[in-house]
Each structure stands twice: as C-alpha cells, then as structure tokens.
Amino acid sequence: MEKVFVSGGSGFISLHLISKLIQEGYKVRTSLRSLDRKQEVIDAVEKEVSTAGMLEFCELDLLKDEGWDEAVAGCDYVQHIASPIPTTNSDDYDIVVKPAVNGIKRCLNAALKNNVKRFVMTSSVAAVGGSNHKFEYDDTDWTDLSMDVAPYQTSKTKAEQYLWDFMKEHEGKTDMEAVAINPSMVFGSSLSDDIGASNLVIKRLIDGSLPFTLNICINIVHIKDVADMHFEAMINDKAPGKRFIASNNHMFFPEIAKVLNDNGFKAPKMKLPSFLARVFSI
C-alpha cells in the first residue's frame, strides 16, 4: 500500500485531502506543529472515513530542519500544503513569507533524498495574478513581485517559483515529478474548527462584523474540488510539470450575501458604492 506525506495536517484543505487519500486506499503520514492537535485531526477525518491503521503523525516546523527527512521517509508521494495564511499580522514578512519559502525548501530536499515519485504543492492564484490588472489569467501568468504586492502574494509566488527552479536545477538527476495547484477562494464545509481563510469572508458576512458588501468580484472553488485536484495531480500521468488553476466560478459580494439571505442567514443588504471600495478593506 502506497503512502503519502501531507504537510500541515490540521488545515482546512489538508483535512479534506487526507480523507480523500484514505478513501482511495492510501496510507497517510501528516505533520503538525504540535502533536497536541493529533486527536483533533483524527476526529475531523473520522467524519469522512475510518483512520484505523491508515493515519500517522509527526511534528515539524517550517522554520526548523529537524525531522523532515524522517517525516518523508517511506512515502511514495508528497502533498505540501503547510504554509502561513493571512492573519491580522499578515503584513509581517517574517511571519508569512519566510516560513513559506523555507518550508518548501525543507520539504523538497526531504522528498528528493527519499526518492519520492511526485511532489504536489498547494500554491494559490495569488501567485498567478496578484499584481497585474488583467481580466483573464492562465497558468503562464505570474505575480509581478517588482510591484507593491502583499506579503501573502509574495509568499505564494516565491514558494512556487522555488519549486520550479528546484526542479529545473535537478532535471535529469532525479525521477521525482512536480505539480502545483493554484486555488482561488476555497469555500465549503470544514471538518474542524479551522474553517480556512476564505470561509472567514462568509463568517464575517453572517456574524455582523461586516455590515455592508462591496461590489467586488472574487473567484471561488469548492473544497471538495480542490481536494480532488490535489489527488488527481498526484496520480494523473499528464499532470507533472504543470500548474493548475483551481477556480470554478466568480461571484460579486452582493450575490454571495443574497445566497446567504435566501438560505436563512442574516447577511448585510447594504451595498457600499464602488468608489468607496478602495477606502475599506475586508
């Protein structure tokens, strides 16, 4: 039975992917910053599938060398998901960018050392169109880091660029393949109390902390589709060497609020004029 290493096992996307992998017959080893959260992860995954004999844990830190080689040892595939998400401190370069870049360096080196078949990275559309003012983007587009972009966009762009630079550097020296998944805003049910950064938008619309909507459009994708894409990226023969934008549709915030209101939630009905959108930050 093949085994997959999943970094950052307590996260929104990770929990759905771990469930998917076990359902498909793969054993999983996942990393946590603290093993104190082990039972939390087990309880979350057990909502979808039995973890008996299929899930094991290790403790890792994106900023520390210790344990990475041992974590990946014996694994056939790597799903590297662990990366800092935007918080109230997301303007701090050291909090967001440094762990993202150093984390993928450590994970790639461990994967290479352990002869992993394929390395799948969770990137983001933030690495695709985070600075250019275009109406359409594809997998050839990259965020221009010479422009004024947020640390989160910088973190995702630099981390993914490191992946492809690493693969180019080791071309012909390893059989390991690589794939990047670039999700947009990921919505859907969470398996734990960690609802994910994207779902915080929905939470703020229904808990009253955002008293108005802005006429801003966002691209969205369902969490189950994101998990499925990570799985297919791992097994599909046509996936290696490519980046895949995971985005299904787009919606304006007033549309999202209407869907929430139509389904019994109390979302704001007041729409802020577009010219004020730049003044307010959500």
Where are these regions (language model features)?
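Glycine/proline-rich active-site loop of Rossmann-fold NAD(P)-dependent oxidoreductases
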Residues: 172-175, 188-201, 233-244
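Mid/C-terminal beta-alpha module of Rossmann-like enzyme folds, strongest
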Residues: 229-282
